[in-house]
Amino acid sequence: MTARRDFTPALGLRVLTPFYDQAIAAFTREGTWRPRLVRQLAPSAGVRVVDVGCGTGTLTRALKRAAPGAKVIGVDPDGQVLGKARARARAEGLEIRFVEGFFDEAFVATRGPFAAVFSSLVFHQVPLAEKGTILRMAFAALVPGGQLHVADYGVQAGGLMRFLFRNTVQRIDGIEDTEHNARGVLPQLMREAGFDPVQETDSIPTPSGAITLFRAEKRGSGETI
């Protein structure tokens, strides 16, 4: 899990990492969409929940506060931001396991299965093929009836949202990986990974473009890892 692989650091550049939380607060209206994402699923005591690409752990901590009895794990390949995540969880007295590494077969085999997989602001940063890989891994990692919950940039409808997205997110993270999100690829990729139903539950206009909330379910008795 700690083998070196490429990943996009917070805000796209390592030099910007110290300003990540301030930028997210200022440009994404996280005070609006994060609570809505958490309310999509209130985990029960004892269930296992993973936050994929947890970063500094803002969503991870919110999940634990919402469901103190749940077993919450955050995974991220960036050790620098995980240091902040661990320190903040300790300061709040929250028992959260943070793992440095990738959400891959090795992680799921040793940490899963999960009742819920959460992810926020990750998919727009990764190539199209990796978006699909992460979603297939999420499907395999979930127990039957488990749910995937995602907050990320979705369709940028209208000139204003396109303009804002182009001049913030795409200036920082580039066009190649982000444009697929802006054209609405995530629901299709979720269905291709096996999720059904797939719902777009909300869309929040922000200074950096529209952020969409998704909820998708793993039905039946499909394979878990």
Residue map of PLM features:
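Conserved class I S-adenosyl-L-methionine
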Residues: 1-43, 58
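C-terminal alpha-helical "lid/dimerization" subdomain adjacent to the S-adenosyl-L-methionine
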Residues: 4-7, 151-193, 198-212
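A short acidic, Gly/Pro-enriched loop at the edge of an enzyme's catalytic core
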Residues: 108-117
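Short glycine-centered segments of the SAM/dcSAM-binding site in methyltransferase folds
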Residues: 48, 145-147
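C-terminal lobe and adjacent flexible extensions of AdoMet/dcAdoMet transferase-like proteins
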Residues: 213-225
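Class I SAM-dependent methyltransferase SAM/SAH-binding core
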Residues: 50, 56-105
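A short SAM/SAH-binding and catalytic strip from SAM-dependent methyltransferases
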Residues: 116-129
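A short glycine-rich, Lys/Arg-flanked "PGG" loop and its adjoining helix->strand segment in the class I
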Residues: 132-144
